[in-house]
Amino acid sequence: MVKRVDLRITGHVQGVLFRHGAREKAQEFGITGWVRNEPDDSVRIMAQGPEDTLQKFIEWCRKGTEWARVEDVEIKWGEATGEFRGFEIQ
C-alpha cells in the first residue's frame, strides 16, 4: 500500500550531506517527495511510496551519512496524495 510519511530528523544532521544522501537513497528506492533543512537544525522529509520501502528508507534515515549523528527520527504516517513526481532537495 502506498503511504506518506513526514519525518523530522534531529542530531548533527545539517552540513553533513544528509539531504544529498537522503535524495540519493530515495531515488534508489523509487520514493517521491522532498527533504529540507529546518531553522531548528533538524532535517524534515516528506516522502511517499510503498510502506515497506518507506520503512527501509526510515532505517537509512536513522543512520544517515557517515558524517551525521542522528539522535531521533520523529515519524508521522498519512495517506499518499500523489502530489510528488520526483524527490527534491528544498
Question: Model-derived features: where do they sit?
Answer:
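Intrinsically disordered, low-complexity, mixed-charge
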Residues: 1-90
